[in-house]
Amino acid sequence: GLTERAVCYDIGAGTGSVAIEMALQAKHGHVYAVERRDDAVELLKKNQAAFHVENLTVVSGTAPETCRDLPAPTHVFIGGSAGNLRDILSMLLAKNPYVRIVATAVSLESIAELTACMKDFAFTEAEAVSVQIARGKKAGSYHLMAGQNPVYIFTMQSEEKP
């Protein structure tokens, strides 16, 4: 899990729910929320203010370019890569070969790319988990559970050598 002094990136941060939660967990660390969409950046800044999170820096732009001058991360969440996943992973591992990475995927293409990256980057620890939610909906006098699209959560890290 996150430590209080973690240095985190939230890449594809959207409106910042993950970044804000990371910042609350890493009380004495820092979180960099990277987002390319202007509308999401504005909402992210509003959410940061609403939750009074001071250890969070909003970075407007696309990874990996906007991350090059940031400090080396200990933990990274990738919620979106804008098609730059391999370049992002290369940049992260160059900064810290032992960084813990969590990434989500919903499309078959993203799932395939993350699965290939788990192998190609030779992570010593790698796992994929599928999570699915079902919502109840009325169908006549019955209630049926309608499955939502599954989300795949990938975790990747290489062990430090003693």
Residue ranges and their predicted role:
Residues A72-G80, D87, R100:
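Short SAM/SAH-binding signature in class I
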